[in-house]
């Protein structure tokens, strides 16, 4: 295409546009004269370099082919298919446009105020000759179809062809992969598929298109058509360009003014910004100051609350509300940490708070120490309070009744497991405080120490009270020294000094027993309470804090160790008292050592088996005392029988009770032996001797020993008392059985020898102070030996029953000795009467037989026999039954020997018969003899009968 002139020409026969129709005539003339087609292609704002553009006259005229108009309804099926995608696209497009307008709102405002014609703003930047005058509307995003505002029945211009159906458009244009870059699609669209591809060629030959002249000509024609259409479009828009250029100039001017004004505004704005920055800095500073002031107020308020709570904590500590104090301290620490986080201020680093924390540490330590002390004092106080519910006498009666040493009592021991609610609450609070202060271990250790000290003080206090009971009349200095003295120091001093320095020597047995009773039973009550306290503590620890439950093992040995402390104290006391223990009567020893054993048994029941030397020491002391008692009793009995006057004494009921107990012990242990009697006075021996010389209406002549009745002498009562003491000792202390058996046999052996020597020996008159030995002496000696034998058998059977031991050969031998000695006493009676009959019969040779009355010899013999009978019948009926017949037979034999020759003389026979008749009559009337008159019958028979006999 050749180059043509660029003179403007707009006479193409096209109708004028809407914009050119409204322009002023003057403006149109000037624009026509000044503008050219070339200027339309230049940059209207910045025409830096010219661009060559051909004029209309330079373009070869081409006949435009009409473009068919397709009605919108033809596109409805297609638009219906893409309605949803198009609706989303339209919605996004409108949103983008709205954001763009909001972003450039100022520019649009300035454009609206300019003199640009509004119609230019409504004109689209892209237009075609086929676009109608009215704008098409966007489809509604909620509708399923797309509609336009144009009318399908608009009559086209005369240059347009008739409507045709869209179905005549090749379907390739509606494919989703439509792309002219694709050679095959291009071949189909260009309708030259037969040129590029033969029937037998699988692929198109693109070189054929380059050599096809028809195709080249058609493409040129297409390009010319496109160019003409572009020129036509430009021509349609050319009428508006002058107005646009003028508006652009005006816009440039206004823009320069606006730029200047904007520059001034920017300078002012800069100043305003600087002032704003300063004001903002000031505001920030003020806000910061206000914030800091608010923070400071909050900090001050927090500190005020903290100090107020700290004051309350101090008051709680002063008032011993330790748990509230500990919780208050912990609450203060928690508040400080919480407020530090909330206020973003390290309150813990403040000097006042540091000082407060130091005070808290002091209070915490004070609370810890106070709670530890209070915990120990509270439990020990409860222990002492429980031990004083009952007094010592009531406790003694209950424990003795429990061990069947006295009759049953109505009262019982208070329950050690009963704790009131206040006690449990106090213990619970203390454990909470100890757990929070990590001082539970220290508290339990101190509690153990306090318990040990309490038991030491308990024994020491009762010991001091017992000493002061005897020292009340002494000077105050001595009493103070005794109160301050400890048991160990007193024990050491008593070993170094004489026995008179021992304060126990001045204590009576009643006072000493009362002291032991207080120590023993108060200690047992304290131990019972401690065991219950330990159970309560372990239960609370197991429920409250399992982490510190292991600390309860500290209390495992508390009971055993406490019992050891008590036993050490009482062992020391008993060792001190044992120096004067030999003077105690058996009842007192039984009472004291029964207390020891009861205390030890209760200790084992409460605390288990202990390793203390208490019971071995007690039993060793008891054995030593028993040996001394055995020796003393044997010597006392031997001396008593040695000085015995052998006079029968009346038997009082108390003596009969002694005999009954000794006799009954072989079958059943007498109740009196198992019962515990209170300590007796030291003048017990004198009181016992009073009833020996006192005769009352209740006294009897003999003592009943089972079915036998025996006359007793003064020493026999002492024997029964000694055996009664032996029985009590064995009933209470079965461990003494071997020593008991040995001592008892030694005692009976000594007594048997002593009685045998005194009664039957030659020194009787000198040792006893008797002028001569009479029949009653021998009869009472026989009764005494019978008492020995019966008592020995009964006591040996009692020993065998209680201890399960068999009778030894020594016992049988001693019993046989008693039998032999009894037979010897019988022989002694016969021997004495033989001497009397020898003296009396010496008169027979000088007698005259012609008198009618009994002779003197037979009268003397009858009197001697009657006297013997009376003595034996009164003092020993057993011997009377055994000895009188023997004496009568001895008399008959001697008389037969002396009177046989005389009786053969008929002149003398009547006198012999009178003597013998008198003898037998006196025996029958005075002695109750009912036997045959053997001698008289012999002398009355004839000589033949006598020879036959």
From Swiss-Prot:
Entry's Gene Ontology BP terms: Golgi to vacuole transport; intracellular protein transport; retrograde transport, endosome to Golgi
Keywords carried by this UniProt record: Coiled coil, Endosome, Golgi apparatus, Membrane, Phosphoprotein, Protein transport, Transport
Any Pfam family matching the protein: Vps54
Coiled-coil intervals, chain numbering: 243-312
GO cellular component, one term: cytosol
Residues with PTM Phosphoserine: 483
Keyword Phosphoprotein: yes
Membrane topology (UniProt): Peripheral membrane protein
Segments for region (Disordered): 1-25
Subcellular location as annotated: Golgi apparatus, trans-Golgi network membrane; Endosome membrane
InterPro entries: Vps54, Vps54_C
GO MF annotation, one: syntaxin binding
Role: Involved in retrograde transport from early and late endosomes to late Golgi by linking the vesicle through the t-SNARE TGL1 to the Golgi, leading to the membrane fusion between late Golgi and endosomal vesicles. Also seems to be involved in protein transport from Golgi to the plasma membrane and is required for the integrity of the actin cytoskeleton.
Protein family according to the UniProt entry: Belongs to the VPS54 family.
Subunit-structure text: Component of the Golgi-associated retrograde protein (GARP) complex, also called VFT (VPS fifty-three) complex.
Name this protein carries in UniProt: Vacuolar protein sorting-associated protein 54
């Amino acid at each position: 295409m050749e180059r043509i002139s660029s003179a403007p020409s707009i006479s193409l026969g096209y109708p004028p546009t809407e914009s050119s129709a409204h322009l002023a005539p003057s403006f149109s003339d000037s624009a026509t004269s000044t503008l050219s087609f070339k200027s339309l292609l230049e940059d209207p704002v910045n025409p830096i370099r010219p661009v060559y553009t051909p004029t209309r006259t330079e373009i070869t005229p081409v006949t435009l082919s009409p473009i068919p108009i397709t009605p919108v309804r033809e596109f409805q099926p297609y638009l219906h298919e893409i309605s949803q995608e198009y609706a989303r696209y339209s919605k996004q497009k409108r949103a983008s446009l709205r954001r763009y307008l909001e972003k450039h709102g100022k520019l649009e405002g300035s454009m609206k105020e300019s003199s640009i014609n509004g119609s230019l703003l409504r004109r689209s930047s892209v237009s075609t000759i086929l676009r109608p005058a009215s704008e098409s509307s966007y489809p509604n995003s909620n509708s399923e179809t797309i509609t336009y505002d144009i009318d399908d029945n608009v009559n086209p211009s005369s240059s347009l062809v008739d409507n045709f159906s869209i179905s005549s458009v090749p379907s390739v244009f509606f494919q989703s992969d439509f792309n002219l870059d694709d050679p095959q699609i291009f071949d189909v669209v260009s309708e030259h598929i037969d040129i590029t591809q033969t029937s037998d060629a699988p692929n198109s030959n693109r070189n054929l298109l380059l050599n096809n002249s028809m195709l080249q000509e058609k493409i040129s024609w297409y390009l010319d058509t496109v160019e003409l259409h572009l020129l036509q479009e430009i021509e349609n828009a050319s009428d508006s360009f002058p107005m646009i250029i003028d508006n652009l100039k005006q816009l440039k001017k206004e823009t320069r003014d606006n730029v200047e004004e904007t520059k001034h505004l920017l300078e002012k704005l800069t100043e305003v910004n600087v002032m704003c920055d300063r004001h903002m800095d000031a505001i920030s500073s003020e806000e910061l100051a206000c914030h800091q002031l608010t923070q400071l107020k909050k900090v001050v308020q927090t500190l005020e609350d903290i100090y107020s709570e700290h004051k309350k904590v101090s008051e709680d500590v002063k008032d011993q509300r330790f748990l509230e104090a500990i919780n208050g301290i912990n609450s203060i620490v928690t508040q400080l940490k919480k407020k530090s986080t909330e206020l973003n201020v390290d309150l813990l680093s403040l000097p006042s708070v540091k000082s407060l924390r130091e005070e808290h540490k002091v209070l915490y330590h004070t609370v810890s120490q106070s709670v530890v002390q209070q915990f120990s004092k509270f439990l020990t106080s409860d222990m002492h309070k429980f031990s004083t519910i009952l007094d010592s006498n009531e406790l003694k009666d209950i424990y003795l009744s429990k061990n069947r040493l006295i009759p049953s009592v109505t009262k019982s021991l208070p329950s050690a497991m009963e704790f009131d609610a206040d006690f449990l609450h106090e213990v619970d609070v203390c454990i909470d405080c100890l757990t929070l202060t990590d001082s539970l271990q220290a508290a339990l250790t101190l509690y153990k120490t306090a318990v040990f000290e309490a038991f030491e003080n308990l024994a020491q206090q009762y010991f001091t009270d017992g000493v002061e009971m005897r020292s009340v009349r002494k000077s105050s200095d001595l009493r103070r020294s005794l109160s301050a003295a400890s048991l160990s120091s007193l024990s050491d001093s008593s070993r170094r000094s004489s026995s008179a320095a021992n304060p126990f020597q001045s204590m009576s047995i009643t006072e000493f027993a009362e002291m032991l009773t207080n120590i023993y039973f108060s200690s047992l009550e304290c131990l019972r309470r401690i065991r219950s306290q330990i159970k309560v503590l372990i239960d609370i620890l197991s429920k409250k804090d399992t982490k510190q439950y292991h600390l309860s093992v500290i209390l495992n040995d508390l009971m055993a160790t406490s019992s050891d402390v008590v036993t050490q104290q009482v062992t020391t006391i008993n060792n001190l008292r044992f120096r004067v223990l030999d003077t105690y009567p058996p009842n007192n020893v039984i009472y004291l050592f029964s207390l020891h054993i009861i205390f030890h048994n209760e200790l084992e029941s409460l605390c288990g088996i202990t390793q203390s030397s208490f019971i071995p020491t007690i039993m060793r002391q008891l054995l030593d005392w028993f040996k001394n008692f055995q020796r003393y009793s044997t010597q006392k009995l031997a001396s008593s029988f040695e000085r015995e006057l052998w006079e029968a004494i009346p038997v009082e009921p108390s003596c009969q009770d002694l005999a009954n107990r000794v006799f009954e012990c072989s079958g059943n242990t007498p109740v009196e032996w198992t019962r515990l009697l209170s300590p007796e006075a030291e003048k017990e021996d004198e009181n016992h001797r009073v009833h020996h010389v006192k005769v009352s209406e209740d006294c009897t002549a003999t003592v009943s020993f089972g079915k036998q009745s025996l006359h007793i002498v003064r020493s026999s009562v002492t024997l029964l008392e000694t055996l009664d003491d032996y029985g009590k000792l064995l009933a209470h202390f079965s461990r003494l059985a071997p020593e008991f058996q040995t001592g008892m046999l030694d005692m009976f052996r000594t007594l048997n020898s002593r009685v045998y020597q005194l009664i039957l020996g030659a020194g009787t008159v000198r040792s006893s102070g008797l002028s001569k030995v009479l029949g009653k002496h021998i009869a009472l000696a026989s009764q005494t030996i019978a008492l020995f034998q019966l008592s020995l058998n009964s006591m040996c059977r009692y020993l065998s029953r209680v201890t399960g031991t068999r009778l030894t050969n020594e016992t049988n031998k001693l019993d046989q000795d008693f039998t032999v000695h009894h037979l010897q006493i019988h022989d002694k009676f016969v021997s004495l009467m033989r001497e009397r009959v020898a003296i009396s019969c010496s008169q027979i040779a000088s007698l005259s037989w012609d008198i009618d009355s009994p002779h003197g010899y037979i009268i003397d013999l009858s009197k001697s026999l009657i006297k013997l009978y009376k003595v034996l019948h009164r003092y020993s009926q057993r011997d009377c039954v055994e000895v009188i017949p023997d004496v009568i037979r001895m008399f008959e034999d001697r008389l037969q020997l002396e009177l046989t020759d005389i009786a053969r003389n008929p002149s003398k026979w009547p006198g012999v018969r009178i003597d013998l008749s008198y003898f037998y009559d006196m025996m029958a009337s005075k002695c109750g003899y009912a036997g045959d008159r053997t001698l008289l019958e012999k002398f009355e028979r004839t000589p033949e009968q006598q020879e036959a006999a």
